[in-house]
Regions:
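Extended, well-ordered alpha-helical scaffold/bundle regions in very large, multi-domain proteins
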Residues: 13-14
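Catalytic or ion-translocation cores adjacent to nucleophile or general acid/base/metal-coordination motifs
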Residues: 1-2
């Protein structure tokens, strides 16, 4: 659903959310530069992956859909943890943990979204048994 119906608008809904994440990260740079930069970089990578995904055919989108959803979740989680930490300094340690330990998982997930479906369709039951 995320990479099919929700991308029918050329990814506009995703871009609006990414814009929100980037604006918040930019605003947080003055008080939490390292955390904010990590969130901004991840959201920019998500933007680039979204652009690539929108340009793929539907089979290729579906092949990368789970990885894309997981990467999007990592970026949004980092965004919301950073916002919570800015609102309540007692939550900054959890935000830092999430951003430094869990957010980096977005990169290999986004790499998977670019692979398309060819490798999936090339797998045969026999190859899985080898």
């Amino acid at each position: 659903d995320l990479v099919a119906r929700k991308m029918m608008d050329g990814g506009e809904a995703a871009y609006r959310l990414i814009d929100e994440v980037e604006a918040a990260a930019e605003a947080a740079r003055s008080s939490q530069p390292a955390l904010a930069t990590a969130v901004w970089n991840a959201s920019e990578a998500l933007r680039e992956a979204t652009e690539a995904l929108v340009g793929q055919d539907l089979n290729d989108r579906f092949a990368g859909s789970v990885a894309y959803l997981r990467a999007f979740a990592r970026v949004l989680g980092a965004h919301y943890h950073l916002q919570a930490g800015l609102a309540d300094p007692a939550r900054l340690p959890l935000a830092a943990f999430y951003i430094t330990r869990l957010l980096p998982e977005y990169a290999p997930l986004l790499a998977q979204t670019r692979e398309g479906a060819a490798g999936l369709y090339a797998l045969t039951p026999e190859a899985l048994l080898a």
